[in-house]
């Protein structure tokens, strides 16, 4: 009986929360504790590449996620719940190109993935959309 409890403790995971914000300009990978109060690691795509146009690329997001995963393992976090977010509001509600890549990189780096949740802010009745009455004219 006691051996079963010890094995259960050995198999238990230490969870954090990975918040991935993927816009079309940049990708943030931010890991906190479960309460969200303490930041464990935060890396952006812009910190990993030199060219501004590459900040939101899947490659930059992958590098950022690998960096975050390494820091998490140092601290002792073995699993993460993922909250992925797009710009939202009156802007686009689909995550940018780096979102999927960051999630895959977290999974492949050895962190266990718990729940995956989309937390993009969706307005119930929003402010007026940018662009004026006749829209954006090209």
Swiss-Prot record:
Alphabetized UniProt keyword annotations: Cytoplasm, Nucleus, Ribonucleoprotein, Ribosomal protein, Ribosome biogenesis, rRNA processing
Gene Ontology biological-process annotations: cytoplasmic translation; maturation of SSU-rRNA; maturation of SSU-rRNA from tricistronic rRNA transcript (SSU-rRNA, 5.8S rRNA, LSU-rRNA); ribosomal small subunit assembly; translation
Intracellular or extracellular location(s): Cytoplasm; Nucleus, Nucleolus
Alphabetical list of Pfam families matching this protein: Ribosomal_S11 (PF00411)
Spans annotated as Disordered: 118-138
Main location: cytoplasm
Protein transport listed as a keyword: no
Gene Ontology MF term list: RNA binding; small ribosomal subunit rRNA binding; structural constituent of ribosome
Compositional bias segments (type: Basic residues): 129-138
Record bears the keyword Nucleus: yes
Cellular component terms (Gene Ontology): cytosol; cytosolic small ribosomal subunit; nucleolus; small-subunit processome
Cited InterPro entries: Ribosomal_uS11, Ribosomal_uS11_CS, Ribosomal_uS11_sf
PANTHER family in UniProt: 40S RIBOSOMAL PROTEIN S14/30S RIBOSOMAL PROTEIN S11 (PTHR11759)
Record text on subunit structure and interactions: Component of the small ribosomal subunit (SSU). Mature yeast ribosomes consist of a small (40S) and a large (60S) subunit. The 40S small subunit contains 1 molecule of ribosomal RNA (18S rRNA) and 33 different proteins (encoded by 57 genes). The large 60S subunit contains 3 rRNA molecules (25S, 5.8S and 5S rRNA) and 46 different proteins (encoded by 81 genes). uS11 interacts with eS1 forming part of the mRNA exit tunnel. uS11 interacts with snoRNA U3. uS11 interacts with MPP10. Component of the ribosomal small subunit (SSU) processome composed of at least 40 protein subunits and snoRNA U3.
NCBIfam families linked: PRK09607.1
Function summary: Component of the ribosome, a large ribonucleoprotein complex responsible for the synthesis of proteins in the cell. The small ribosomal subunit (SSU) binds messenger RNAs (mRNAs) and translates the encoded message by selecting cognate aminoacyl-transfer RNA (tRNA) molecules. The large subunit (LSU) contains the ribosomal catalytic site termed the peptidyl transferase center (PTC), which catalyzes the formation of peptide bonds, thereby polymerizing the amino acids delivered by tRNAs into a polypeptide chain.
Further details from the record: Present with 3370 molecules/cell in log phase SD medium.
Similarity comment: family membership: Belongs to the universal ribosomal protein uS11 family.
Protein name: Small ribosomal subunit protein uS11B
């Amino acid at each position: 009986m006691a051996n079963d409890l010890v094995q259960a403790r050995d198999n238990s995971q230490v969870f954090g929360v990975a918040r991935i914000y993927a816009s079309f300009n940049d990708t943030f990978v931010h890991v906190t504790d479960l309460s969200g109060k303490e930041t464990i690691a935060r890396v952006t795509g812009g910190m990993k590449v030199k060219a501004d146009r590459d900040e939101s690329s899947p490659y930059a997001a992958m590098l950022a996620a690998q960096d975050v995963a390494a820091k998490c393992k140092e601290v002792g976090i073995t699993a993460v719940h993922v909250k992925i977010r797009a710009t939202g509001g009156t802007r686009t509600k689909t995550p940018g190109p780096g979102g999927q890549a960051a999630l895959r990189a977290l999974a492949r780096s050895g962190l266990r993935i718990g729940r995956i949740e989309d937390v993009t802010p969706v307005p119930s009745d929003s402010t007026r959309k940018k662009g004026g009455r006749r829209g954006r004219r090209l």
